[in-house]
Amino acid sequence: SGNRFELLLDGPQFFPRMLAAIAGAQRQVELELYLLTAGDCATQLVERLCQAALRGVQVRCLLDGFGSLGLPSVQRAQLLGAGVQLRLYNPLGWRRGLRNLYRDHRKLLLVDGELAFVGGTGATDDFWQPQDNSHAWHEVMVAISGPLVADWQQLFERQWPASLARLAWRPQPHNGLPRLPASPRQGDGLGRVAYADGRQHRDILHS
């Protein structure tokens, strides 16, 4: 309980909010993203991350090794040069065979351990074109504040070191999650983070 949720519809609504949150970060920023390709949207994101790192904020970016192939090497170098800690999840390798199919599809932005943005977006011009604040693809993100942010932070902290071994962290299986009451009071939202992957989804099915 004690959480606040705000549904943000489409890139023109959620990307400016996400960039503003990065710009206002005081201590730390964590970004976990699948799709990141060259364009104005990615440029805006990279610039905000670099600016945060240059003013002393700890910035960690975990990008999927396949989904981020479209990010130019010059922008990767820009991130590293500014002091951003950059890791790739499961970079492609010809010896890895079917293990190349293991991808990190999480889309998560955490700011100062107090604010989370989670949803389905990628950082491409299809989701947001900054020049005219337009979009081609429909997508949603949810802005979250409150105790639930700590659960998202925990997922990132688990996946961050696991990425070095090209592994996905998995919690212990459970027998299902308690059902949540409908329509909590505004500003007193109830929520739960349920982790799942292709082989571990029983908690969500039983919640």
PLM regions: where:
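Charged, low-complexity intrinsically disordered terminal segments
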Residues: 1-207
